[in-house]
Curated annotation (Swiss-Prot):
Source organism superkingdom: Bacteria
One annotated Gene Ontology cellular component of this protein: 3-isopropylmalate dehydratase complex
Enzymatic reactions: (2R,3S)-3-isopropylmalate = (2S)-2-isopropylmalate
A Pfam cross-reference name: Aconitase_C
Purpose: Catalyzes the isomerization between 2-isopropylmalate and 3-isopropylmalate, via the formation of 2-isopropylmaleate.
InterPro entries, per database record: 3-IsopropMal_deHydase_ssu, Aconitase/3IPM_dehydase_swvl, AconitaseA/IPMdHydase_ssu_swvl, IPMI_Swivel, LeuD
Recorded name of the encoding gene: leuD
Species, as recorded: Methylobacterium radiotolerans (strain ATCC 27329 / DSM 1819 / JCM 2831 / NBRC 15690 / NCIMB 10815 / 0-1)
Name listed for the protein in its UniProt record: 3-isopropylmalate dehydratase small subunit
Keyword Lyase belongs to the record: yes
Keywords attached to this entry: Amino-acid biosynthesis, Branched-chain amino acid biosynthesis, Leucine biosynthesis, Lyase
Flavoprotein among keywords: no
Any one GO molecular-function label of the UniProt entry: 3-isopropylmalate dehydratase activity
Length: 200
């Protein structure tokens, strides 16, 4: 998993509230267990018209936001079913950070397991970030995970909270397997000690 330290770039504003996982990636695209190739289907029903052409009104189809790695989202982002394909699609598109006032719990946890930092902010801070993002290519956000800050294009900074375990894993690029391998010496020592306790 790619490490997450500092991320700087244009943020795409998606003001829609209650975007569920079926809108993030519709069920018809869930026939694969591969994490790659799903980016083209991200927000498919919003990104594309019925004839398959791009919807020019959708934010990620607009020139300033095509390569956005940060998504500023409306309330309750990632609600609905627990499909892990939703963060897979975001990551495959290139999104590394999503910011909202609230996320569905399972989606929130799945993001961290797939290298995406999900940040919860206050409604007031979210509105400021929306305003910054809506300035387009002339305004960038900088997300610093170590410092737990988001710096806006005018230099203003806001602080966010993050679980220490989640922070450690993202900073070091550790998924659950990587975290286990990081502790393999402790696991080996425990197993050796257990083997000596034949009565256990």
């Amino acid at each position: 998993m790619e490490k997450f330290t500092t991320l700087e770039g244009v943020a795409a504003p998606l003001r829609t509230i209650n975007v569920d996982t079926d809108r993030i990636i519709p069920a018809k695209y869930l026939k694969t267990i591969r994490r790659t190739g799903l980016g083209k289907s991200l927000f498919a029903e919003m990104r594309y018209r019925e004839d398959g052409s791009e919807n020019p009104d959708f934010i990620l189809n607009q020139p300033a936001y095509r390569n956005s790695k940060i998504l500023v989202c409306g309330d309750n982002f990632g609600c609905g079913s627990s499909r892990e394909h939703a963060p897979w699609a975001l990551a495959d598109f290139g999104i590394r950070c999503v910011i909202s006032t609230s996320f569905a719990d399972i989606f929130f946890n799945n993001c961290a397991k797939n290298g995406i930092l999900a940040i919860v902010v206050s409604p007031e801070d979210l509105e400021k970030l929306f305003e910054d993002a809506e300035r387009g290519a002339n305004a960038t956000l900088t997300v610093d995970l170590a410092a737990q800050t988001i710096r806006g294009p005018d230099g203003g900074t806001l602080h966010f909270d993050v679980d220490e375990g989640r922070k450690h894993n993202l900073l070091n690029g550790l998924d659950e397997i990587g975290l286990t391998l990081e502790r393999v010496s402790s696991i080996d020592a425990y197993e050796q000690k257990l083997a000596q306790r034949t009565w256990a």
